[in-house]
């Protein structure tokens, strides 16, 4: 297995427009950052698996089907009979930027337990990936951190996306503390230009990533929206330009970027990776993200390998 992702899969109720009376219209799309990444990487040629928890309901069954249809191994997905599948309402403004409202108190994804994540699954993966949404509450917080620590000991490369959603946390201070907690376990980190100052206190990519690298993180990406990506690879830093596109909806763009990058990095060794090779991978990831951004929804918008290479 190339990439195992752990965390939330949920229903994104994504605004698609308004009717003649001005009432917003919504589509029920599959979402959740770790699930998004698993699909993005799978469509681009990687073998991926997802571990998370859904409710014993129609949405839960639908999400499992969508992941399986996209060749994501869902044998590790758990079903919770007592808690419903999580939903988020995603409103999109005229520029394509998103606003999230989560319906998530005591929902299935938060109920992921240590026992739901086997050593066998962790041992089989080259890369084990997670985000911070599963760190917002227990038992999923303890389960996710425990899995990352176990995977690290078993030799996996650990990747992490803080993926800050303000309305999922008690307050900003708690969010920052919990988002920082896994950093010493992480080999490859992706943050947005909005998350960098939360974690480091600075908007400067050079000094911010230098600070993050003190945790032992070997490769750091700072996504800059339409402006591409800044990277720190050991002592080397650089920038790879974005790919211009007409914005439809930015939902899933960051997950597509990271999934695309990891679909290539899972075939490389960080010890022997060159800067030229890395920049080629990031150009590929930027193109994949631009295609997603030009469409609507997260998983439905993600490109195939032929579309990115074409």
Give residue spans per PLM region.
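Glycine-rich phosphate/adenosyl-contacting loop at the front of the ribokinase-like
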Residues: 1-73
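Proline-centered loop/turn at the N-terminus of a beta-strand
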Residues: 2, 157, 188, 218-219
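Conserved phosphate-binding/catalytic region of the ribokinase-like
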Residues: 3-4, 149-150, 201-310
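Short beta-strand scaffold segments in enzyme catalytic cores
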Residues: 39, 87-91, 228-231
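Conserved N-terminal subdomain of the carbohydrate kinase-like
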Residues: 47-130, 310
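Conserved beta-alpha-beta core of the PfkB/ribokinase-like small-molecule kinase fold
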Residues: 133-210, 228
């Amino acid at each position: 297995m190339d990439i195992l992702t752990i965390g939330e899969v949920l229903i994104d109720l994504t605004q698609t427009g308004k009717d003649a009376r001005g009432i917003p219209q919504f589509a029920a799309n599959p979402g959740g950052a770790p699930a998004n990444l698993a699909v993005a990487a799978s469509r681009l040629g990687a073998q991926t698996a997802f571990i998370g928890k859904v409710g014993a309901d129609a949405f839960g069954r639908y999400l499992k089907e969508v992941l399986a249809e996209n060749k994501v191994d869902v044998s590790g997905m758990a079903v919770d009979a007592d808690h419903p599948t999580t939903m988020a309402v995603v409103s999109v403004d005229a520029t394509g930027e998103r606003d999230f409202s989560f319906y998530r108190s005591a929902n299935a994804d938060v109920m992921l337990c240590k026992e739901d994540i086997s050593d066998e699954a962790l041992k089989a993966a080259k890369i084990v990936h997670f985000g911070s949404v599963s760190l917002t509450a227990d038992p999923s917080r303890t389960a996710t951190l425990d899995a990352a620590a176990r995977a690290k000991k078993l030799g996996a490369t650990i990747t992490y996306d803080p993926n800050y959603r303000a309305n999922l946390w008690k307050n900003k201070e708690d969010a920052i503390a919990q988002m920082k907690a896994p950093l010493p376990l992480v080999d490859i980190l992706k943050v947005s230009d909005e998350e960098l100052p939360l974690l480091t206190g600075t908007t400067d990519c050079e000094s911010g990533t230098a600070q993050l690298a003190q945790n032992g993180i070997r490769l750091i990406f700072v996504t800059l929206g339409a402006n591409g990506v800044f990277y720190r690879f050991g002592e080397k830093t650089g920038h790879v330009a974005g790919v211009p596109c007409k914005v439809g909806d930015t939902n899933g763009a960051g997950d597509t970027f990271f999934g695309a990058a990891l679909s290539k990095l899972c075939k490389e060794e960080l010890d022997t990776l060159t800067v030229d090779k890395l920049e080629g991978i990031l150009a590929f990831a930027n193109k994949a993200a631009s295609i997603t951004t030009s469409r609507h929804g997260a998983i439905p918008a993600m490109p195939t390998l032929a579309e990115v290479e074409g």
